[in-house]
A protein has these predicted regions:
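Glyoxalase I/VOC metalloenzyme domain signal
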Residues: 1-31, 37-99, 112-125
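Short, small/polar residue-rich loop motifs at catalytic or cofactor-binding pockets
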Residues: 37, 105-108
Length: 125
């Protein structure tokens, strides 16, 4: 059995570009709609499925204010502080920073961010 995360967003082309930039991901599979959005797009990092993205079938209501999500994507063992900082800068642009970059009780360098698509990320070294 396998499990993989998928997000549904308004603005799937922009979201794919942003996640590729934030995490060094590559598009490994894609199906576009007649409206030039993604019906389904799979991103890989180091040859492993990282995230799937699809255009939301209706206009998503994204509250960009400080809202606690009931689900988060935890991306850890990113290798360097520079990798974490890059992801933080990309994801926080237009999003909401919950916890700024720095140490916490269980990690030396991490942050919590809700990106401009309403997706909650915990990123860490």
């Amino acid at each position: 059995m396998k499990i993989s995360p998928q997000v549904y967003v308004t603005g799937s082309l922009e979201a794919v570009e942003m996640y590729c930039k934030a995490f060094g991901a590559e598009i490994s599979f894609q199906i576009k709609t007649e409206e030039n959005t993604y019906a389904h797009c799979e991103l890989t990092v180091n040859g492993q499925l990282f995230l799937a993205i699809s255009e939301a079938p209706f206009d998503c209501d994204h509250n960009k204010e400080h809202v606690w999500q009931n689900m988060a994507f935890n991306v850890y063992e990113m290798g360097t502080e520079e990798a974490v900082r890059n992801a933080y800068e990309v994801l926080s642009d237009g999003g909401t920073v919950i916890d700024t970059l720095g140490p916490c009780d269980w990690n030396a360098y991490c942050a919590n961010v809700i990106d401009k698509f309403g997706v909650f990320w915990w990123i860490a070294i």
